[in-house]
């Protein structure tokens, strides 16, 4: 039986404009960094997407390298979109990113125009869509002129392959410069994605949070629960089915400290 969205999906969710743009994002988004790779359970992936959308979560956040293996999260989400969610595409905000290593050779990572635009084309193909709503540069590139990376985002938008531009994990100075470049290009730069939780509050002190607020750019957090450390999952040790035990790429046992246990809900 094909999926039909809940008739009450917009009854309780709160939506906020991203910066000064007209795009409204839900208070919670579904990030596909974990759980949607080739090692995941496809039925669980569908259930997560359906439950999210049924509760008004319209924003699905991806990146070219989400997996494992890289690209598999986009492929799996694309399959769900094609098989179950295609009728709701205009109700969804789909975002993806490029910046980390995606393929071998000198053109497979960082921030060159060649890499960013090729990666976006690959992402669109994997997901089976004509455009994404937001295309991010995923990290600062110390070896590519910032103008080149930002012009690639501008090209993505003006070609119709993305509706809005964003950046991720940029420091204050590069955020300021990126904003100036994109403003001059008249490119709709609306969002900055950064790590933010009670374990990592750097944007409150490094100037990024206040600068973006003052200049009409939205902030969206990734890992607000510190990959589960801020839940009750680890209060009694490390479960066998936990991310620390089964994956270990991004979350490690040495991050499970007495402080993290004290900050988790009891």
Please provide the spans of the model-predicted regions:
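Short, acidic/polar
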Residues: 39-53, 110-127, 146, 175-179
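Alpha-helix N-cap and loop-to-helix initiation/capping positions
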Residues: 40-44, 72, 76, 107-115, ...
């Amino acid at each position: 039986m094909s999926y039909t969205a809940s008739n009450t999906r917009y009854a309780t969710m709160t939506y906020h404009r991203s910066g000064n743009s007209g795009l409204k994002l839900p208070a919670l988004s579904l990030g596909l960094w974990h759980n949607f790779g080739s090692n995941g359970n496809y039925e669980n992936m569908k259930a997560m997407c359906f439950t999210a959308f049924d509760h008004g979560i319209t924003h699905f956040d991806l990146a070219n390298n989400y997996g494992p293996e890289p690209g598999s999260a986009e492929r799996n989400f694309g399959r769900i979109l094609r098989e179950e969610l295609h009728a709701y595409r205009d109700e969804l905000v789909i975002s993806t990113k490029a910046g980390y290593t995606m393929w071998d050779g000198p053109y497979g990572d960082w921030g060159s125009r060649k890499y960013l635009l090729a990666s976006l084309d690959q992402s669109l193909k994997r997901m089976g869509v004509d455009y994404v709503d937001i295309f991010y540069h995923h990290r600062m590139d110390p070896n590519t002129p910032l103008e080149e990376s930002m012009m690639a985002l501008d090209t993505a938008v003006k070609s119709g392959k993305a509706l809005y531009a964003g950046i991720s994990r940029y420091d204050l100075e590069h955020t300021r410069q990126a904003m100036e470049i994109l403003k001059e290009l008249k490119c709709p730069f609306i969002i900055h994605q950064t790590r933010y939780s009670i374990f990592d509050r750097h944007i409150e002190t490094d100037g990024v949070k206040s600068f973006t607020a003052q200049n009409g750019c939205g902030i969206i957090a990734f890992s607000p629960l510190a990959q589960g450390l801020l839940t009750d999952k680890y209060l009694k040790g490390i479960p066998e089915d936990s991310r620390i035990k089964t994956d270990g790429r991004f979350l490690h046992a040495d991050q499970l400290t007495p402080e993290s246990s004290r900050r988790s809900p009891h």
